[in-house]
Amino acid sequence: CTIASAGGMISNPKMSVYAASKWGVIGWSDSVRIELQEMKSDVHFTTVAPYYINTGMFDGVKSRIIPILKPEYVAKRVFRAIERNKAFRGIPFGFHFIRFWQAILPTRVFDFFFGKVFGIYHTMDHFTGRKSTKESAGKAS
């Protein structure tokens, strides 16, 4: 199982390097999955792409419609995807359809819905991220 990110399926301002790494993970995982399938291997490959998870890594992220995910919820979905031999699973449900919507909608329409309606393009506006141990210790003094 490979844990990627929804950031590997949908571009987001202020996340270009992160998105590039996750796009790479998704492409690599899918290629390995196909290679194993072509070899008729009994090894199965599951790639999971969750939305923001409340682990501290994305502190300050604000999501208008889609809730920030709890780690326990994501863990259950990951295990379920593995048990069911799913090749790809977006979390929450429906995120695995992003590629479909990108393929059929004109870019302006896709950007309108995901940027303006869902607010995804502004989720990082107040991002602070997880504070390092040194930063936290300095504030405590």
Where are these regions (language model features)?
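Active-site helix of classical SDR
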Residues: 21
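Hydrophobic alpha-helix immediately C-terminal to the catalytic Tyr-X-X-X-Lys motif of short-chain
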Residues: 24, 28-36, 48
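C-terminal helical subdomain
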Residues: 47, 63-99
